[in-house]
A protein has these predicted regions:
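Conserved PLP-binding active-site segment in aminotransferase class I/II-type PLP enzymes
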Residues: 1-77, 99, 163, 194-234
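Conserved alpha-helical elements of sugar-nucleotide-dependent glycosyltransferases
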Residues: 37, 41, 88-91, 183
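Short, conserved clusters of charged catalytic residues that mark active-site
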Residues: 40, 107, 149
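Short, well-ordered alpha-helix to beta-strand connector turns
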Residues: 51-52, 117, 135-137
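Conserved SAM-binding loop
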Residues: 56, 84, 156
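PLP-dependent aminotransferase-like
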Residues: 69-131
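Active-site region of PLP-dependent enzymes
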Residues: 128-234
Length: 234
């Protein structure tokens, strides 16, 4: 029995459906409401990584943003600066700015994963290997060039249940999906950052094919020097 309230508009007709959910059933996975597939994927990734909880998001960048917002809005941290490598992807300092902090670029040699100091937040976008969970909030990516190339998507890994529950509502417009939409009082002013069931299904199918141990797909030599970019020096 699904814990979710049923889709308000019902199911799509077969000719409009993406194939991943049917492929998942053919591979032996069982689910009722399609949103259960997101749960399956979250639990599968969390177990693979060595974390207690996984919260699927529509991209790694939004996972970083929500992790930063947890520290700012829930933990009420007064830290102003977040220290990151100067050689990384440009969305990382942008999310820091969007979350209300200021990025500080440092010379850091890294591979696969690095910390957004002083917080226990880890950008693990370019690492995918069994047991990879570091600590705190560890965010992974399912972008097209990553080891699990869904095309778009990410996941926040954590051992903190309170944070996991908060993230789950914040990714879906503040909604509690176990309550009917008409009855939900929307506990939080959330974001539209959820992962679709079809993308989660693709992630499951890919995980069942990709090796458990993989080399990092990026490091400090993969990216340009963000400390020289005009947008971060204004």
């Amino acid at each position: 029995m699904t814990e979710y309230k049923s889709w308000p508009l019902g199911q799509l007709p077969p000719e409009f459906q993406r194939p991943e959910l049917d492929q998942l059933k053919k591979n032996g996975y069982k689910f009722g409401d399609p949103r259960e597939v997101v749960d399956i994927f979250e639990k599968k990734v969390a177990k693979f990584a060595g974390a207690k909880y996984g919260i699927a998001v529509d991209c790694c960048s939004h996972g970083l943003f929500l992790s930063l917002k947890w520290y700012k809005d829930v933990m009420k941290m007064i830290t102003e600066h977040i220290h990151i490598p100067r050689y990384t992807y440009c969305s990382v300092p942008m999310q820091i700015i969007h979350a209300g902090f200021k990025p500080v670029f440092e010379d850091v040699t890294w591979s696969g994963i690095y910390q957004l100091r002083p917080f226990d937040i880890w950008d693990g976008a370019v690492r995918w290997t069994q047991g990879m969970y570091k600590s705190g909030f560890h965010i992974v990516s399912f972008q097209l060039k990553k080891r699990i190339p869904i095309g778009r998507g990410g996941m926040i890994l954590t051992n903190d249940k309170k944070a996991a529950d908060w993230f789950r509502k914040m990714t879906y417009d503040g909604r509690d999906l176990t309550i009917s939409y008409m009855d939900d009082d929307f506990e939080y002013c959330g974001y539209h950052y959820y992962m679709t069931p079809e993308d989660a299904a693709r992630g499951i199918l890919l995980m069942d094919q990709v090796p458990n141990k993989n080399l990092d797909s990026g490091n400090n030599r993969t990216y340009s020097d963000l400390s020289t970019k005009r947008i971060f020096n204004e």
